[in-house]
């Protein structure tokens, strides 16, 4: 991913909006709600003083968490104006998300048929909930990284990581278990949610943060 987009840094581009990534194409019934039980659940379990270094994941494997940690650091990097996703504790936030009803798709309509070719306005069209998307997507992402560079994503240089993230975003990367775009869209959206939630003073006092259960909404 290039460091600048239309005259703005990557950080500016990612932080100036919290709209959904286009590839997700989900319903907007909850877009106006900024305080949500799911985010509160992930936040209240976390310790505001715990750093990314000493946090031990409870759902992701060590290898998966290394990918998440490296990726969010590239998606929202720190700069002279403030901390990035890593410093804000986004990896911990995403890991804790995986232990909430959101990650199991508890509030989603997940009955078939699923048709990925339908217009995006009709909502998410894969039979996969977030836990599955991350587990399969992380495996495919590291497999693609090894195919391209001989190393897993977390071991690559920053420039190499940026290039691979761009490939995931565009769909150029060839995943075998789900579309690369779908994996990237979830990762990007959850990174944004985690960053804004963890940066919100309400998170520190356990009063919740940003909505994260907006993602897939399918019409029946």
UniProtKB/Swiss-Prot annotation:
Superkingdom, taxonomy of origin: Bacteria
UniProt key word Secreted: no
Signal peptide: 1-42
Temperature dependence: Optimum temperature is 30 degrees Celsius.
Modification comment: Predicted to be exported by the Tat system. The position of the signal peptide cleavage has been experimentally proven.
One GO term describing the cellular component: plasma membrane
Sample GO molecular function, one term: gluconate 2-dehydrogenase (acceptor) activity
Catalytic activity as recorded in UniProt: D-gluconate + A = 2-dehydro-D-gluconate + AH2
UniProt EC number: 1.1.99.3
Residue spans crossing the bilayer: none
Enzyme class: oxidoreductase
Activity versus pH, per record: Optimum pH is 5.0.
Signal listed as a keyword: yes
Keywords, alphabetical: Cell membrane, Membrane, Oxidoreductase, Signal
Pfam families: Gluconate_2-dh3 (PF13618)
Main location group: membrane
Location relative to the cell: Cell membrane
Membrane topology field: Peripheral membrane protein
Role according to the record: Part of the heterotrimer that catalyzes the conversion of D-gluconate to 2-dehydro-D-gluconate. The role of this subunit in the heterotrimer is not known.
Assembly and binders: Heterotrimer.
Protein name per the record: Gluconate 2-dehydrogenase subunit 3
Source organism (scientific name): Pantoea cypripedii (Pectobacterium cypripedii)
């Amino acid at each position: 991913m290039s460091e600048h987009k239309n005259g703005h840094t990557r950080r500016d581009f990612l932080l100036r909006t919290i709209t959904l990534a286009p590839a997700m194409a989900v319903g907007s019934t909850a877009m106006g709600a900024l305080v949500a039980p799911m985010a509160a659940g992930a936040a209240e379990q976390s310790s505001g003083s715990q750093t990314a270094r000493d946090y031990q994941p409870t759902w992701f494997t060590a290898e998966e968490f290394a990918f998440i940690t490296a990726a969010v650091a590239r998606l929202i990097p720190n700069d002279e104006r403030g901390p990035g996703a890593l410093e804000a504790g986004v990896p911990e936030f995403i890991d804790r998300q995986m232990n909430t009803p959101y990650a199991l798709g508890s509030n989603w309509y997940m009955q078939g048929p699923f048709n990925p070719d339908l217009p995006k306005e009709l909502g998410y069209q894969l039979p996969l909930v977030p836990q599955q998307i991350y587990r399969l997507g992380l495996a495919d992402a590291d497999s693609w990284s090894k195919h391209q560079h001989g190393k897993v994503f977390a071991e690559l240089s920053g420039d190499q990581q940026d290039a691979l993230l761009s490939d995931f975003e565009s769909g150029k990367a060839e995943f075998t278990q789900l579309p690369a775009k779908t994996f990237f869209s979830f990762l990007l959206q959850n990174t944004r949610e985690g960053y804004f939630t963890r940066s919100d003073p309400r998170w520190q006092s356990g009063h919740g943060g940003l909505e994260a259960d907006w993602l897939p909404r399918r019409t029946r």
